[in-house]
């Protein structure tokens, strides 16, 4: 909330007459420390998966009021072109784009998930695209639908026009869960090369975000550069999952060093996933990442502040917490506890300490 400015000129005059100095902190407007769109969240399951219930207006309003200025969402290719490339069902994406536009929250779509007909190995859902051109054509259809001249905006003039200008091409291709055929470097570079051409033909001002890299991400980034990837993306992306807060900054710095070595010192970086799960004592096999809910909240605040303090030096354009809402019920998956909020079994939502930490951090960094 903005601080009230109670007649600062008159108050200063009265203090001057009394021989006292005016207190500038009471009159000063809160100072924004980060650019607009810097604090974001990932709308992961259960609200971001288009095969489920999609995003709800009430939750997106809660995002906006708590300081979320960018929302990363999954656009699953397999949902839009399940049966073949001839036609695209935009229904799941329309719902997401419409809800975000209605609540004036910018989107960063991550486009992934190969339909069976387009896979290298049709029986493996994690298999990569057999032909980059198929993915490129799908990306073109998304720009035609949601870009500056998109058909979605013509059909929904009741909505604020919020065209999508930034697209993230895939997620963690260095992980077999998302790209089964390893090593992935050459095939992934071919994919983003074809997709970027298709996107820019339809929107010359569009920007392409590299897939978020995980683990020893700086090593993976170097491999992408060596495979010729440099000219095919406009933003770097990294997922600095680590046990220690200090290692988050170190991982981001390592990626910046690699980018600089390959001539991309000025290319901006997005931290498209940052998290610690509040899974301590909740899963059968404890992991090094497990934290209590209060630990999770304090790490969130410290990590956002640490990255904000170094955002200019490291070229960090935005940071996304993963995730907005999780179930917090799994006995085997720590990442089911990463949410700022928890979805109860009865369908109601509980705000966790991390939610309030995010909101307070956003108010401070965004000058609210």
Predicted feature descriptions by range:
Residues 63-216, 225, 229:
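Substrate-binding cleft and catalytic face of glycoside hydrolase catalytic domains
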Residues 20-32, 239, 368:
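N-terminal low-complexity, Pro/Thr-rich disordered segments
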Residues 34, 50-53, 136, 140-165, ...:
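Noncatalytic carbohydrate-binding groove/subsite architecture in carbohydrate-active enzymes
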Residues 27-69, 74:
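Boundary/entry segment of secreted carbohydrate-active catalytic domains
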Residues 37-43, 69-73, 107-111, 165-169, ...:
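Hydrophobic faces of well-ordered beta-strands that scaffold small-molecule active sites
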Residues 51, 89, 118, 163, ...:
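Aromatic-rich peripheral "rim/lid" segments of glycoside hydrolase catalytic domains that contact
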Residues 42-57, 78-91, 117-118, 174-178, ...:
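Acidic-and-aromatic substrate-binding clefts and catalytic sites of carbohydrate-active enzymes
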Residues 2-27:
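Secretory targeting and sorting signals
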């Amino acid at each position: 909330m903005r601080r009230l400015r109670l007649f600062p000129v008159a108050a200063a005059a009265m203090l001057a007459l009394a021989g006292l100095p005016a207190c500038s902190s009471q009159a000063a407007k809160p100072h924004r420390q980060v650019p607009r769109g810097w604090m974001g969240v990932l709308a992961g399951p259960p609200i971001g998966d288009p095969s489920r219930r999609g995003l709800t207006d009430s939750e997106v309003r809660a995002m906006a009021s708590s300081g979320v200025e960018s929302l990363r969402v999954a656009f699953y290719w397999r949902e839009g072109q399940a049966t073949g490339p001839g036609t695209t069902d935009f229904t799941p994406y329309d719902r997401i784009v419409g809800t975000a536009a209605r609540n004036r929250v910018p989107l960063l779509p991550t486009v992934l998930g190969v339909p069976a007909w387009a896979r290298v190995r049709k029986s493996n859902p994690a298999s990569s695209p057999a032909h980059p051109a198929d993915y490129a054509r799908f990306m073109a259809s998304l720009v035609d639908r949601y870009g500056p001249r998109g058909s979605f905006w013509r059909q929904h003039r009741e909505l604020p026009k919020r065209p999508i200008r930034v697209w993230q091409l895939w997620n963690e291709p260095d992980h077999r869960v998302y790209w089964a055929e390893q090593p992935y470097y050459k095939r992934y570079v071919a994919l983003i090369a074809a997709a970027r051409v298709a996107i820019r033909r339809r929107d010359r001002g569009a920007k392409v975000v590299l897939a978020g890299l995980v683990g020893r991400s700086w090593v993976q980034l170097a491999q992408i550069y060596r495979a010729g990837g440099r000219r095919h993306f406009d933003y770097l992306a990294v997922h600095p999952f680590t046990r220690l807060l200090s290692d988050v900054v170190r991982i981001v710095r390592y990626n910046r060093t690699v980018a600089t070595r390959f001539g991309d010192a000025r290319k901006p970086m997005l931290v498209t996933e940052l998290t610690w799960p509040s899974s301590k004592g909740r899963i059968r096999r404890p992991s090094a990442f497990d934290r209590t809910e209060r630990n999770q909240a304090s790490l969130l605040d410290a990590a956002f502040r640490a990255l904000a303090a170094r955002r200019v030096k490291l070229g960090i354009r935005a940071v996304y917490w993963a995730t907005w809402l999780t179930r917090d019920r799994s006995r085997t998956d720590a990442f089911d506890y990463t949410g700022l909020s928890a979805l109860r079994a009865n369908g109601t939502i509980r705000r966790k300490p991390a939610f309030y930490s995010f909101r307070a951090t956003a108010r401070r960094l965004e000058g609210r």
